[in-house]
């Protein structure tokens, strides 16, 4: 039986990611560019600012600000006290970021972040999966502003997270249902890359390290056999399907599922929440035994409790 899920309306469409800040408040960004904060104690939700783009992944920065991965505008830093925004990065090697998606931040302020596609923007995310462009990338930005490409040719690079020991960075490949692991060297640079978890039962989106030390993974949709078959088809066929009417393209199923893994990739939790009022989980944060969820399509965030916590 699906687990109960509490829905929290947000004044904006597509609350894609969620972030719990040290004060316990829950932040999210919506498709209209707005950044909102919800107070679980009072139940109040406030719109703080707008980026002028499409905010996706959110992350705590060591200086108390909030990192915003804006699909249109790149990496931004939000001061929650003043609601001011600073642009940290818009391009890499002279090429503007087309689909800045998600990030993880180490204690020294180094930002590891994903760019999902060099071909399609967030509004055409489905086109990238159908065409199987494999143009996703993982980057590393040091506090002095230097940026290096860590991985490329990823199949829709998506969620990024640190392991509990901070000895590796993980990045989800939505198109291949895989999570890759990049070892961190003693000096904080990227080492070898390996597959951490593969053959997931669905397409992963955002991932995050929880307060329980586990890596939480959203399963945005169960494995789509049509999409899997299509990705093996000739390029011309993929292009033809991309141009079909939206109703004829492969689409996510209406589920609300998250999984949690330990530091070596062993499954610890597989939670299937009630999706009758809320679905398509794309963002996740575990905090004190509660799982907060964001959705690319819902004008709401949601939460449920981890059984046994």
Regions found by a protein language model. Name each.
Residues 1-309:
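Sequence-structural signature of mature extracellular/luminal beta-sheet repeat domains
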């Amino acid at each position: 039986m699906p687990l109960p899920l509490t829905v929290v309306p947000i004044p904006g469409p597509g609350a894609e990611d969620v972030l719990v800040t040290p004060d316990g408040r829950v932040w999210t960004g919506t498709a209209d560019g707005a950044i909102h904060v919800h107070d679980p104690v009072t139940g109040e939700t406030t719109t703080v600012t707008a980026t002028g783009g499409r905010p996706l992944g959110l992350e705590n920065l060591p200086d108390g600000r909030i990192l915003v991965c804006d699909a249109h505008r790149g990496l931004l830093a939000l001061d929650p006290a003043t609601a001011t925004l600073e642009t940290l990065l818009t391009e890499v090697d002279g090429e503007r970021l087309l689909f800045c998606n998600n990030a993880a931040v180490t204690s020294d302020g180094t930002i590891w972040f994903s760019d999902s596609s060099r071909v399609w923007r967030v509004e055409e995310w489905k086109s990238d999966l159908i065409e199987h462009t494999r143009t996703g990338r993982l980057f590393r930005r040091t506090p002095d502003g230097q940026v290096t490409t860590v991985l490329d040719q990823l199949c829709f690079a998506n969620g990024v997270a640190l392991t509990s020991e901070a000895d590796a960075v993980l990045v989800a490949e939505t198109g291949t249902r895989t999570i890759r692991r990049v070892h961190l060297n003693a000096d904080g640079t990227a080492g070898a890359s390996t597959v951490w978890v593969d053959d997931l039962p669905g397409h992963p989106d955002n991932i995050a390290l929880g307060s329980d030390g586990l890596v939480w993974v959203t399963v945005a949709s169960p494995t789509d056999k049509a999409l899997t078959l299509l990705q093996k088809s000739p390029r011309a066929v993929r292009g033809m399907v991309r141009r079909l009417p939206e109703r004829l393209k492969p689409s996510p199923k209406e589920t609300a599922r998250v999984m949690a893994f330990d530091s070596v990739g062993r499954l610890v939790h597989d939670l299937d929440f009630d999706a009758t009022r809320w679905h398509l989980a794309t963002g996740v944060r575990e905090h004190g035994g509660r799982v907060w969820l964001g959705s690319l399509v819902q004008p709401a965030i949601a939460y449920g409790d981890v059984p046994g916590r």
